[in-house]
């Protein structure tokens, strides 16, 4: 399998996922200059030769994205059920070719859906309403987080957003331990894709205790993906939707919104928050 490593902050010249373009800057006077823009390309996830989904994504950490998406969508239950991940760049985008175990591929064919996603869109193309909600085993109550350590995590979040720092155009998803230390994270123009990348990285790391921190709002699917991968706590910098709260309540996930220095709104299962 392609090696998966957490994103690290690097110099501007080395940053993948961003390009410089000529722009006209208007502030009283018009001034031509160069500016950094985040890259957004179509990424097709192809399982055993069959295209399953096309998402718009930032072209970095794509092996982690493929693994995390496969886990959070219930296509696989462990990384060992993927034998290889290979990238094939093309004129119109990038194909990520994933070799599944025969048992998992047979299951995928049974419930296969064709999706053509917008940026980070996770339900485009689903044919039936019943397909939106996946069965999730209720999470255990084995973890806790002291809100005093949330400020530490928030202060480190930009470390996993080198493209975001240049462009102001990416979401971040990070794994934080109970002391608020950021262990790793990813960024993408799509918040769901950033989360899938993180979940893919976490699957290859010995990170058990801790929580997910995202720079975006918390939609129902962010909750669903987090719970599918066994994480018990999700911190979102912005608000949560009503459906996100309902799903979090049902699957025993602690959902926290408006995660800011010195404050937070706990929507569900507050017993994990100290």
From Swiss-Prot:
Cystine pairs: none
Pfam entry (one): FdhD-NarQ
Residues annotated as the enzyme's active site: 121
Residues at which Mo-bis(molybdopterin guanine dinucleotide) binds: 258-263
InterPro entries: Cytidine_deaminase-like, FdhD
GO annotation, cellular component aspect: cytoplasm
Keywords: Cytoplasm, Molybdenum cofactor biosynthesis
Coiled-coil region: none
HAMAP family: FdhD
Task performed by this protein: Required for formate dehydrogenase (FDH) activity. Acts as a sulfur carrier protein that transfers sulfur from IscS to the molybdenum cofactor prior to its insertion into FDH.
Family: Belongs to the FdhD family.
UniProt protein name: Sulfur carrier protein FdhD
Organism from which the protein derives: Yersinia pestis
